[in-house]
């Protein structure tokens, strides 16, 4: 990262499932705490896989978080003493999240967001592409393809061990029981006609 002389910027951490996005967000938040900065972490209410009130990485690291159901609810929890605002699973927030993040950065906060940049079909997911476009720093992480061992940039959704169809619902909260990291070549998304 470069030294930034002005306060207020946006950092995006993105990638496939199991690429370490939440782990990296937690690492950055912990570093701010060592620096005696005040950080607050948010997560969408829909993300209750491991905990209702913590951001938890797949390897078990965790940090306290405020669950919110709407992007603009974040403003209710911000105080002037805050230095850093972190938001996990940003792809699950409503369309207002881009404006919320912009406003916070413009007010002088360091805003760190983490989320999937692609849905299970391999298409841009939610507001993450817009956040990547307005961010000062973008970190794109990769996992390891569970099929061949290559770098994985995609998320394979599985239903009873088989790839989910293209027109299945986009949002399905889950972990290793429903998803695997895959490379471009091992990622499969059949249409319902193919099944």
Swiss-Prot record:
GO terms for biological process: DNA biosynthetic process; thymidine metabolic process. Zn(2+) binds at residues 145, 148, 183, 186. Its main location: cytoplasm. Disulfide bonds: none annotated. Transmembrane segments: none annotated. It catalyses: thymidine + ATP = dTMP + ADP + H(+). ATP binds at residues 15-22, 88-91. Its EC number is 2.7.1.21. GO terms for molecular function: ATP binding; thymidine kinase activity; zinc ion binding. This is Thymidine kinase.
């Amino acid at each position: 990262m470069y030294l930034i002389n002005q306060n207020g910027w946006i950092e995006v951490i993105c990638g496939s499932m199991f690429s370490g996005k939440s782990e990296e967000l937690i690492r950055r938040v912990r570093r701010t705490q060592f620096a005696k900065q005040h950080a607050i972490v948010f997560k969408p209410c829909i993300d209750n896989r491991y905990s209702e009130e913590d951001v938890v990485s797949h390897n078990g690291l965790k940090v306290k978080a405020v669950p919110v159901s709407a992007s603009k609810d974040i403003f209710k929890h911000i105080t002037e003493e805050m230095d850093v605002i972190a938001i996990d699973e940003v792809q699950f927030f409503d369309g207002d999240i881009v404006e919320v993040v912009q406003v916070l950065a413009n007010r002088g906060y360091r805003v760190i967001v983490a989320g999937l940049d692609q849905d299970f079909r391999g298409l841009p997911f939610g507001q993450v592409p817009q956040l990547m476009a307005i961010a000062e720093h973008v970190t794109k992480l990769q996992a390891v393809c569970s099929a061949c061992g290559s770098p994985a940039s995609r998320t394979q959704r599985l239903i009873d061990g088989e790839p989910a169809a293209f027109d299945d619902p986009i949002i399905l909260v889950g972990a290793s029981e429903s998803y695997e990291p895959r490379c471009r070549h091992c990622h499969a998304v059949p249409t319902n006609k193919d099944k």
